[in-house]
Design a protein with these regions (language model features):
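Helix N-cap/capping motif at the beta->alpha junctions
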Residues: 32-41, 63
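Receiver (REC) domain active-site loop signature in two-component systems and cognate sites
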Residues: 58
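Active-site residues of response regulator receiver
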Residues: 55
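Conserved acidic carboxylate
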Residues: 10
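Short amphipathic alpha-helix used as the core "switch/output" element in two-component signaling
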Residues: 41, 64-76
């Protein structure tokens, strides 16, 4: 079996590149999207995606909206939400949250908590 595939969804190019590198270092095959619409297109086209790492605050479709749509389309997909502006209190129960700035230990713990 190949490496697990993750979809990083982040509108900030620098943050997106940082997250991509971080997940590659954790052994993932990484795809990235610059907004929610792009993420949904990739999710539809790439059935191997098993985990999403999603910024909560994005223009257009927010991370919370994206998580809801993704779960409707792919009920078994695991989602980790992230933000530097909101706290865990806005994150739905059962969804992992990692605050920005990211620490590798927190991200690794959230991934393990996602039960891939």
């Amino acid at each position: 079996m190949g490496k697990p595939s993750i979809l990083v969804v982040e509108d900030n190019p620098l943050s997106r590149a940082t997250a991509v590198d971080m997940f590659k270092n954790l052994g993932f095959t990484v795809l990235d999207a610059y907004n929610g619409h792009h993420a949904l297109a990739l999710l539809e086209a790439r059935p191997e995606i098993s985990l999403m790492f999603v910024d909560v605050r994005m223009p257009g479709i927010s991370g919370l909206e994206l998580a809801k749509v993704a779960h409707k389309r792919r009920p078994n997909i695991k989602i980790i939400l992230t933000s530097g502006y909101v706290g865990e209190d806005v994150v739905p129960s059962g969804v992992n949250f990692v605050p920005k700035p990211w620490r590798m230990e927190q991200v690794a713990q959230a991934v393990c908590g996602s039960k891939l």
